[in-house]
């Protein structure tokens, strides 16, 4: 939920946008509970206290990112403005293996995926899928190198460092999947995902970061998508959240999913302007999602 345009508008009009209050999981665009409460009454009280804190503080705004739909409705009832976004999620429809999944796609999409995987295989690339204690420090060092390279490729600065990845490797090893691509006996690319298993079975995998130090055609799709899809099928996970941006995910079996955020702006004029903008944007989001569903890659009747 990017608000750079809002911050820019504030700056151009000589109004400070920072500091602002943010309720979110850092660096993690994943929908989940943002108001931690024992019951609905406590949740309402806590949400109201959060809004009151914003109103009484010297901040420009309050932003709650990726709450559950129920929480979004709660913030809406309190007068906050709702914003919608689109992510792409893959759903495991009880697939037994990757070809089982491919069989649900239209012929052209199925053929394209097989061609992409073949290019990587023919280039001599092999893969290691590592979880838990199997992830060594050398693997973290290489992944961190790939992570930094991705940011350099996009002329940006990385937020996380090697020590962060080492730390999560120690504190939550059973929730991490690290894919290492190798060619000629050396690593050339990697992808990191986080997953959680539900108590009753199933679970969700969240794609996070990917990077490469050598170019191989279609390596991104194989490392960051197809290897993770195979893991989901083998592990019995229900969902693979591929994140935002990239209609290319649609052609690979990821369907659009609407996400939510809630916003309060202290400045009356800006609040009114953003409210009108969000009304128009929401209409565009709904039309966009409908169009994406019309072009989904599955055989008709197989969604």
Residue ranges and their predicted role:
Residues 1-303:
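N-acyltransferase acceptor-side catalytic subdomain
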């Amino acid at each position: 939920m990017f608000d750079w345009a809002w911050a820019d508008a504030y700056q151009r009009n000589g109004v400070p946008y920072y500091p602002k209050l943010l309720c979110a999981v850092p660096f993690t665009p994943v929908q989940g509970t943002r108001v931690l409460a024992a019951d609905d009454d406590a949740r309402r009280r806590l949400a109201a206290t959060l809004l009151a804190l914003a109103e009484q503080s010297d901040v420009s705004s309050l932003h709650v990112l990726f709450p559950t739909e129920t929480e979004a409705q709660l913030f809406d009832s309190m007068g906050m403005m709702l914003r919608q976004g689109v992510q792409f999620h893959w759903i495991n429809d009880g697939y037994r293996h990757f070809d089982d999944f491919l069989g649900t796609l239209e012929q052209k999409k199925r053929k394209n995926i097989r061609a992409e995987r073949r290019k990587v295989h023919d280039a001599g690339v092999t893969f290691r899928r590592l979880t838990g204690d199997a992830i060594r420090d050398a693997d973290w060092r290489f992944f961190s190198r790939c992570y930094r390279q991705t940011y350099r490729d996009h002329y940006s600065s990385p937020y996380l460092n090697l020590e962060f990845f080492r730390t999560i490797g120690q504190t939550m090893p059973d929730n991490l999947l690290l894919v290492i691509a190798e060619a000629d006996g050396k690593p050339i690319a990697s992808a990191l995902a986080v997953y959680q298993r539900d108590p009753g079975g199933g679970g969700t995998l969240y794609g996070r970061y990917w990077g490469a130090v050598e170019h191989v055609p279609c390596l991104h799709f194989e490392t960051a998508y197809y290897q993770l899809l195979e893991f989901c099928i083998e592990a019995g996970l229900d969902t693979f959240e591929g994140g935002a941006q990239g209609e290319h995910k649609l052609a690979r079996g990821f369907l659009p999913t609407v996400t939510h955020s809630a916003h309060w702006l202290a400045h009356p004029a800006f609040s009114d302007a953003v409210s009108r903008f969000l009304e128009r944007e929401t209409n565009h989001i709904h039309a966009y999602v409908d169009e994406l569903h019309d072009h989904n890659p599955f055989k008709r009747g197989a969604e």
